[in-house]
C-alpha cells in the first residue's frame, strides 16, 4: 500500500513543473503534520567534527533554501539538515525555467543561481527554533554582484554563528559565474584564512567552535584536488563535502533537457562524485571528515560512499536533493 501511495504522490508532483513541485513539497512540510524524529539507535550514531549525529544520513543544502522546514525534515528521520545556500542579500536567481527533469536518467539539471531570501529572512526563521534539538547547518554563499565575494562568506559566518551547528562554504555551484574560481589555490587560501579567522573570533566570544566544511565540485582535475587538500590540511579545515553538481553530460540517455546549461545531479552524479571522494581521502589522510553527496538513493549507494571516504572515521552522506524523487 505504501508503494501505491508513493507512486500516486510522485505522479501528482510530476503533473507540475519541477520548481512548482519543489515548492509544493515545502508547503506540505510547513503544515506541521509531520511527526516523529530521527532514530535513536546508538549503532547509527556518529561523531564528526565534534558533533554527535543521531545517524549519518542528512538532507543536503538546496532543498530548504530559506530555512522554512528544518524541524520537519529532522522529524522525517534525517540525522541532520542543511539550509541554504544563503547569500547576504536576497536574489532571484536565474530566469525560469531553470530546473529540468531527466526522467530516464533519474536526474535533473538546474541553473537556479543561488535564489534565496537572504540573511535577514533565514536569520529570523532560525531564531525561532533557538534552543531546539537537532543539527541544522547553514550553507553560505556570495551574491552574484558582490564586489568582494569572500566578504560575503565572512558575513555569513558572523551572522549565523549563534544559530548554526556547522557551516558549509559553497564555492562550487556552476550557476554563479566565476564562483568556482575560488577553488583555485591562491583564492582558496585567502577564502579559508578569512572565513576561519571570523569563525575563531566569533567562537572566542561565545566559547563555541562551529565546524566549517568546504563544498567542492566533482569536475576538478587531480592537480586541483592536490591544492584543495593541501590548503584544507594546512588551515585545519573541519571537513570537505564532496560534491556539488557536475557540468558533465557523459552517458545521459534522456533526449529532452540534456542540452540545458546548469549543474547535473541525481544518479549520473554518483560515480563521478564517489571517485572524487576516494581521491580526496587519499590526499587528506584518514582523519579529516569527508561528507559524500551525490546520487545517494539507497542503502547500497550510501554504503559505497562510506567505503570510498571513510578509512578510519565515518563519512556522512546526504541525498542529492536535486534528483527527481521525492521533491521534484
From Swiss-Prot:
Pfam families: DHO_dh. It catalyses: (S)-dihydroorotate + a quinone = orotate + a quinol. The chain crosses the membrane at residues 21-38. Its cofactor is FMN. The keyword Hydrolase does not apply. GO terms for biological process: 'de novo' pyrimidine nucleobase biosynthetic process; 'de novo' UMP biosynthetic process. GO terms for molecular function: dihydroorotate dehydrogenase (quinone) activity. Its main location: mitochondrion. Keywords: Flavoprotein, FMN, Membrane, Mitochondrion, Mitochondrion inner membrane, Oxidoreductase, Pyrimidine biosynthesis, Transit peptide, Transmembrane, Transmembrane helix. Pathway: Pyrimidine metabolism; UMP biosynthesis via de novo pathway; orotate from (S)-dihydroorotate (quinone route): step 1/1. Substrate binds at residues 65, 110-114, 170-175, 244-245. It is a single-pass membrane protein. The active site is at residue 173. PANTHER family: DIHYDROOROTATE DEHYDROGENASE (QUINONE), MITOCHONDRIAL, DIHYDROOROTATE DEHYDROGENASE (QUINONE), MITOCHONDRIAL-RELATED. This is Dihydroorotate dehydrogenase (quinone), mitochondrial. It comes from Cyclocybe aegerita.
